[in-house]
C-alpha cells in the first residue's frame, strides 16, 4: 500500500493507534444512528478524529512522529519532498489566523489536530507514561481543545445549526 511506503515504522504506529482508537471508542456506531449530512454529525466526527489522534500519540510515543505522520498522510508527500521542522510548525500555529474549514468536513484541519496533540502531550499524565488520566485533567484539556476547534472550524459551523440561533 502507498501508506506503508510513505510512513516509517513509528509513523505507521501513530496511524495504527489512531485507527484502533476509532474502534475502541465505537466511533463507527454513530453513523448508524445519526444523520450523516448534518452539521452536528460533522462536528462530532471532527471531535472523534481528535480523540483517536490521542491514541495514535500513545501508540507512537512521540509528538514529532505523530505530527510528521499527519503531515504525510494529509499531503501524500514523502520525506524527500517534505522538510520537517515540527518545532517551527508548532510555533506557526499561534500565528495562524482563523482557518476556515468546510462545515461538511469530517476531519479537523491539521492545525487543530496538531494543537490538540500538543495540549495532550503537555498533560502530566501523558508525561508519566499515559497510564492514568484524571477526568478533571481530560475535561480541562477538552475545554482548551474546544476553544481551538471553535476558533478554527466548529464555531462558525455551530452558527448554522437552527437550535443555536434561537
Where are these regions (language model features)?
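Catalytic Zn2+-binding segment of zinc metalloproteases
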Residues: 2-13, 19-34, 64
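Short amphipathic alpha-helical coupling elements at transmembrane boundaries
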Residues: 14-15, 54
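Short amphipathic C-terminal alpha-helix that caps PH/PH-like domains
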Residues: 16-20, 114-117
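Short helix/loop segments within enzyme catalytic domains
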Residues: 28, 35-94
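Alpha-helical membrane-targeting segments
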Residues: 32-40, 99-104
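Pan-zinc metallopeptidase signature
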Residues: 83-166
Amino acid at each position: 500500500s502507498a501508506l506503508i511506503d510513505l510512513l516509517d515504522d513509528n509513523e505507521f504506529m501513530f496511524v495504527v493507534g489512531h485507527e484502533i482508537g476509532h474502534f475502541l471508542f465505537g466511533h463507527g456506531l454513530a453513523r448508524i444512528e445519526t444523520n450523516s449530512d448534518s452539521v452536528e454529525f460533522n462536528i462530532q466526527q471532527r471531535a472523534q478524529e481528535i480523540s483517536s489522534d490521542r491514541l495514535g500519540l500513545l501508540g507512537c510515543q512521540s509528538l514529532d512522529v505523530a505530527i510528521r505522520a499527519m503531515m504525510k498522510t494529509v499531503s501524500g508527500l514523502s520525506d524527500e519532498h517534505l522538510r520537517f521542522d515540527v518545532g517551527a510548525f508548532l510555533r506557526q500555529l499561534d500565528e495562524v489566523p482563523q482557518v476556515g474549514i468546510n462545515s461538511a468536513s469530517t476531519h479537523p484541519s491539521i492545525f487543530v489536530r496538531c494543537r490538540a496533540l500538543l495540549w495532550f502531550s503537555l498533560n502530566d499524565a501523558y508525561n508519566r507514561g499515559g497510564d492514568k488520566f484524571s477526568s478533571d485533567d481530560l475535561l480541562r484539556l477538552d475545554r482548551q481543545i474546544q476553544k481551538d476547534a471553535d476558533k478554527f472550524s466548529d464555531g462558525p459551523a455551530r452558527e448554522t445549526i437552527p437550535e443555536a440561533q434561537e
